[in-house]
């Protein structure tokens, strides 16, 4: 596995085409530890595709991706899964939590699946949920409010102490009050924990919280306001 001197997230020369359409055209992007970058753009412009490439769920035709000092482009599936668990945290629009499990069980799950001790996983999950303001009782996650579910999803993404935190429309399904709380939580948490945060959103109000904003259109990623 190739090691890099840089931490955070770096994308270089990334290209992805599907059915003759270019979604990512030599994309260049870097996010330093503790920094936040928001990517906006029209629906279907390739924003989520960029995140899927970083996660290794789809394979780009060209380019390199380095996360947490590790070049992950071209890794075999077993190596990629290991690096993804250790280096990347992900928050989706709808949380992708198991509704029948309690918040603690959902948050502890990544550690348990990676062979961690049950006691340690649950203790850490309870600490994170308390820190993020989520009830840590036995109530099924599916019965929580939308904001509480997203906070639980953030806790689950953080339990492995990732170098890079990815968020795909994390506030898109929330009411205004919950949206404000989750957005504030994401940006504050990334800064305080030294995570490189890359967030995809249609919401310019949410995007304005980021240290930098980029727009993806026609396959080209450019910093907002750049000439």
Q: Predicted regions: what is each one?
A:
Residues 55:
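Helix-to-loop junction immediately C-terminal to a conserved catalytic motif
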Residues 63-71:
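Conserved ABC transporter NBD signature motif
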Residues 101-109:
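Short coil-to-helix segment of the ABC ATPase nucleotide-binding domain corresponding to the Q-loop/switch region
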Residues 128-142:
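Conserved ABC nucleotide-binding domain
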Residues 140-144, 148-150:
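Conserved ABC ATPase signature
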Residues 165-168:
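Catalytic Walker B motif of ABC-type/P-loop ATPase nucleotide-binding domains
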